[in-house]
């Protein structure tokens, strides 16, 4: 899930389906004001969980990122890749002793950027590529030098993979129903029929 808050205060998208949107909006406005990205956590153990609207239980961890041309110069290129249906991932350092906000942008064949050291970069790229191959977004927990099974460093990997294809042969009533379901489930649906009238 993703949500953008513009300088005008306008909101695009949703993170929690309304549960903590008000608190996230306020935190986002603060990020816009200070131009400093931040991590926030809302959960049932927080004293203010009910106050911010987290009545459904659970925990939500968010990284609120300030984005403009100077802070995120790769943003337009990433958007173009997504528009062209090319797989791309962004690995952002969201928790560490230093370097918060550092990022690596990667495709299936190349990567640019750094999280601070070569070992951490290598581990993050390896983990992010595996997530990108499955179209999965997840936070990687690593050691400061990329060690596995540690949680000193958190790297949030956003994967933007093209939708899987569903090819339906035969343009009949049944195909129309399957196409609607396929599209609803996130597939890029193609219906093929040898009869020009129905294709």
PLM feature spans:
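Segments forming oxygen-rich coordination pockets for charged ligands
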Residues: 1-199
């Amino acid at each position: 899930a993703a949500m953008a808050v513009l300088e005008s205060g306008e909101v695009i998208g949703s993170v929690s389906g309304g549960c903590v949107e008000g608190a996230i909006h306020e935190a986002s406005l603060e990020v816009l004001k200070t131009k400093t990205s931040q991590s926030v956590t809302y959960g049932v153990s927080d004293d203010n969980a009910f106050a911010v609207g987290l009545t459904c239980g659970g925990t939500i961890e968010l990284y609120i990122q300030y984005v403009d041309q100077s802070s995120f110069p790769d943003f337009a290129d990433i958007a173009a890749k997504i528009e062209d249906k090319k797989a791309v991932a962004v690995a952002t350092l969201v928790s560490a002793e230093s370097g918060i906000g550092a990022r690596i942008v990667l495709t299936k064949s190349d990567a640019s950027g750094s999280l601070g050291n070569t070992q951490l970069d290598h581990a993050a790229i390896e983990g992010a590529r595996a997530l990108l191959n499955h179209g999965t977004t997840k936070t990687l927990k690593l050691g400061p030098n990329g060690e596995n099974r540690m949680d000193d460093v958190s790297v949030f990997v956003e994967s933007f993979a093209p939708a899987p294809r569903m090819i339906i042969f035969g343009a009949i009533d049944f195909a129309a129903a399957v196409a609607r379901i396929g599209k609803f489930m996130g597939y890029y649906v193609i219906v093929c029929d040898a009869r020009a009238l129905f294709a």
